[in-house]
Amino acid sequence: MIVLGIESSCDETGLAIYDYSKKKLIADELYSQVKLHKKYGGVVPELASREHIAKLNLLAKKIFKETGLSFEDIDCIAYTAMPGLVGALMVGATFAKTLGLIHNIDTIAVHHLEGHLLSPLLDHNSNIEYPFVALLVSGGHTQLFEVKEFGEYSLLGESIDDAAGEAFDKTTKLLGMGYPGGVEVANLADQATDKSKYILPRPMKNKPNLDFSFSGLKTAVLNTWYDEQDQSLENKANLCYAFQNAAIDVLVSKCAKALQKTKNTRLVISGGVSANKLLRHQLDLLAKNREYQIFFPPMKYCTDNGAMIALAGAYRYVNGFKDSNLEINVKARSPL
């Protein structure tokens, strides 16, 4: 069973073809709009939608040409329906529904977060057994789930204000750095010369619940930098180091608590922030010390991509899900 996946929830246009029977990704194409939005310091929704319109058909032609496949080989077309930028989602959903109508192929709506949650399965070496705890950590979401079976997701905790990735992005703006924030902070943190110069708070780290808060950490960065008389690049690197350490410390601590609370031994990490080297290192240490299994997506599939949508669509399709009509139903916000 072969699925075409379409991702267009924000500023990445992604198409991929996944073979469920072989558990193999056949093809993957991605167009990133980062350069387009970089000069604005963030994603401009109208521009994102227009770029999706311009690129989707081109990527589709490319992916079929390179694989030698045709629409006759496709059993289902999966597309991101929620959450995301409504205009961008509309473009992808309309493209998918149109292809489905023309070629008489079933379509299926996919939740963007479910795509992220399953993305570690794109690693051929990943054999993830249920149940497990999952941390979805990105620019828009920071959530902990207990996953008992496919489609059975119990929310354990989430950010009560800024998502972790959002805090990274806002920190770069506060410090007059570039976009996207996660990469900029991590790169500059690696250049820190005085790693103990700044001590920042770990919001909610010691709370017994599994919720997160990153707004206070962001404010602490602002106040610290405002009071700093020597705003040199060296001190900016030191502050990035302190911020990254604080944010990652909270994430790892909450993951450990979630595993203890649910008595699970398997942890899945996904979303854009899962590419962070320090997060991966600290979680690997946690796994080693407590004999947990940690699963990450391949680095190229941490951020938004069509492969995870094709994968999630395949799992939904074999579990009996598919669109019942041609109605376009996308949502900016939607819990998993």
Swiss-Prot record:
<feature type="binding site">
    <location>
        <position position="112"/>
    </location>
    <ligand>
        <name>Fe cation</name>
    </ligand>
</feature>
<dbReference type="InterPro" id="IPR000905">
    <property type="entry name" value="Gcp-like_dom"/>
</dbReference>
<dbReference type="InterPro" id="IPR017861">
    <property type="entry name" value="KAE1/TsaD"/>
</dbReference>
<feature type="binding site">
    <location>
        <begin position="136"/>
        <end position="140"/>
    </location>
    <ligand>
        <name>substrate</name>
    </ligand>
</feature>
<dbReference type="GO" id="GO:0005506">
    <property type="term" value="F:iron ion binding"/>
</dbReference>
<dbReference type="InterPro" id="IPR043129">
    <property type="entry name" value="ATPase_NBD"/>
</dbReference>
<feature type="binding site">
    <location>
        <position position="304"/>
    </location>
    <ligand>
        <name>Fe cation</name>
    </ligand>
</feature>
<feature type="binding site">
    <location>
        <position position="182"/>
    </location>
    <ligand>
        <name>substrate</name>
    </ligand>
</feature>
<keyword id="KW-0012">Acyltransferase</keyword>
<keyword id="KW-0819">tRNA processing</keyword>
<keyword id="KW-0408">Iron</keyword>
<dbReference type="Pfam" id="PF00814">
    <property type="entry name" value="TsaD"/>
</dbReference>
<feature type="binding site">
    <location>
        <position position="169"/>
    </location>
    <ligand>
        <name>substrate</name>
    </ligand>
</feature>
<dbReference type="GO" id="GO:0005737">
    <property type="term" value="C:cytoplasm"/>
</dbReference>
<keyword id="KW-0963">Cytoplasm</keyword>
<comment type="similarity">
    <text>Belongs to the KAE1 / TsaD family.</text>
</comment>
<dbReference type="InterPro" id="IPR022450">
    <property type="entry name" value="TsaD"/>
</dbReference>
<keyword id="KW-0479">Metal-binding</keyword>
<protein>
    <recommendedName>
        <fullName>tRNA N6-adenosine threonylcarbamoyltransferase</fullName>
        <ecNumber>2.3.1.234</ecNumber>
    </recommendedName>
</protein>
<dbReference type="GO" id="GO:0061711">
    <property type="term" value="F:N(6)-L-threonylcarbamoyladenine synthase activity"/>
</dbReference>
<feature type="binding site">
    <location>
        <position position="276"/>
    </location>
    <ligand>
        <name>substrate</name>
    </ligand>
</feature>
<feature type="binding site">
    <location>
        <position position="116"/>
    </location>
    <ligand>
        <name>Fe cation</name>
    </ligand>
</feature>
<comment type="function">
    <text>Required for the formation of a threonylcarbamoyl group on adenosine at position 37 (t(6)A37) in tRNAs that read codons beginning with adenine. Is involved in the transfer of the threonylcarbamoyl moiety of threonylcarbamoyl-AMP (TC-AMP) to the N6 group of A37, together with TsaE and TsaB. TsaD likely plays a direct catalytic role in this reaction.</text>
</comment>
<keyword id="KW-0808">Transferase</keyword>
<dbReference type="GO" id="GO:0002949">
    <property type="term" value="P:tRNA threonylcarbamoyladenosine modification"/>
</dbReference>
